Each structure stands twice: as structure tokens, then as C-alpha cells.
């Protein structure tokens, strides 16, 4: 299913280099808002900074792909020293192809980490890569996202009804 989650993690810090290695994933495309940090925040939680460093030490390639504007994405990504794409138009998968080529990995070696089913999970499914969904880090500040969250509820329920677990 394009929208129902495949994998769900409590937050990004529960995605480990060991888990990625078991799945042969060498590169991650990362969303920002409610994935790495709270919605619209420029502050990175300490535990997420440590997680990013652990991923780098493990050789995992990282790129930010966000639907946000350049003025939102660029300062955040540059502070972290990460490559980035802004206004990526997820769920359309085109930016994922750009990110894959920049990271110089095969499609089967990458996954997308995000919090929204109708943007992140659908983009991953359309591109043919795993979507690693995380529980949102905080409340949604945009009316459009609040509306999408209501639509997402049935897909989250499908995941758990099928025996899906939060990792």
C-alpha cells in the first residue's frame, strides 16, 4: 500500500546503524519537521545530534529532502553540514532521485525517514524504497498538516492491526 507504513520507529534515534546494515541500507534521506526536530524549529535536539554523528561514523550517507522553503531548510542543513533539497514536492519522488545520485548509491541501498504518510511514506513507495516512519516529535503547526494527520489515522491503524510494531 502506498500510504500504510512499512516500518515505524519511536523516533529517529531508534534507527540504528546495525538495523540499517541488516537491511543493506547505506544512505538515508531525512525529513526535517517533526522528524529531526519540532515543526518549524531551527534547534536540533541533543539526542538527534548524537544520532547523526553515530550515523556518520557508521558510514551512512545522509541528505535532507524537505518540502520546506529554502529559508527554512538551508540554515538548518548547513548548521548540520548536510546536503539538502528544499521545496521537494513530496510525495512526488523526483527529489529522491536527485538525492540518490548525489549520494552515489543504488536505489535498493537507500531509505527515507519521515513522519507524514501522505508526503514521506508515499514518496518512498512511489520511488520504490523503504519508508522509515517516525512518531512526530511535536505538534503540527500548519493547518494543511493537521488535516492530513486526520486522514492518516486509518493507515496507522492498518499497520498496527496487521501486527506492526513501533521499533
Each PLM stretch: what is its role?
Residues 1-30, 37, 41-42, 47-112, ...:
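Asp-based, Mg2+/Mn2+-dependent phosphohydrolase catalytic module
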Amino acid at each position: 500500500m502506498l500510504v500504510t507504513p512499512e516500518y515505524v520507529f519511536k523516533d529517529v534515534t531508534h534507527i540504528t546503524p546495525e538495523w540499517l546494515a541488516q537491511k543493506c541500507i547505506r544512505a538515508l534521506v531525512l525529513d526535517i519537521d517533526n522528524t529531526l526536530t519540532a515543526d518549524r524549529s531551527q534547534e536540533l535536539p541533543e539526542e538527534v545530534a548524537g544520532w547523526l554523528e553515530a550515523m556518520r561514523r557508521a558510514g551512512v550517507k545522509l541528505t535532507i529532502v524537505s518540502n520546506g522553503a529554502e529559508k527554512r531548510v538551508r540554515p538548518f542543513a548547513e548548521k548540520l553540514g548536510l546536503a539538502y533539497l528544499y521545496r521537494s514536492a513530496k510525495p512526488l519522488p523526483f527529489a529522491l532521485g536527485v538525492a540518490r545520485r548525489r549520494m552515489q548509491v543504488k536505489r535498493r541501498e537507500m531509505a527515507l525517514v519521515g513522519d507524514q504518510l501522505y508526503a514521506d511514506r508515499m514518496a518512498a513507495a512511489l520511488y520504490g524504497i523503504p519508508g522509515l516512519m517516525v512518531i512526530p516529535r511535536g505538534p503540527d503547526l500548519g493547518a494543511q498538516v493537521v488535516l492530513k494527520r486526520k486522514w492518516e489515522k486509518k493507515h496507522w491503524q492498518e499497520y498496527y492491526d496487521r501486527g506492526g510494531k513501533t521499533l
